[in-house]
Amino acid sequence: MKANFQNSDIIVRKGEWSMDAIFNRTSVRKYKQESLKKEEIDLILKAAFSAPSARNSQPWQFIVVENKDTLKDLSQMTTYASFLKDAAMGIVVCADKSKNDSLDYCQQDLAAATENMLVEAKSLGIGSCWLGVYPNEERYLALNQYFKLPKGIVPMWMISFGYIDQEEVAKDKFDSSKVHYEKY
């Protein structure tokens, strides 16, 4: 089902959130037991589709998971995803090799889409955490089998989303020693 953004009641913000959301985004691993609103999910996905991609190939497929049993199953696929069972939603981010057969380029495109989702979630007051899958063969094969993915669709990572139930402490990560002008 496609989201209809043309006729929705969603108010388009004019960037007042972007820098605050970027500077204050944290990885959230503790969530309130509340479902996300459909409009919020649609905005998070719209942010993903607004990302740049090589040759505008948009080599992404997203599996949106809200079912608690499925989230629990996903949380058991790796020790690093244990908190996914308590999230309101998970998204499995997959590369579509029919759009670009280079997983190296797909990773760049999917990373841009993922960061857009993380920032949009933060702007909506929703926490998130990026959970690596690929290139860990055991993890991506488990997801591939679990979702019975068609040939050419490669699960790259998962993202947990939910209303925040932990103290967030954003850190200023800027490090001028890692910035070089004109030469290294």
Region spans (language model):
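Acidic, surface-exposed loops and disordered segments
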Residues: 1-184
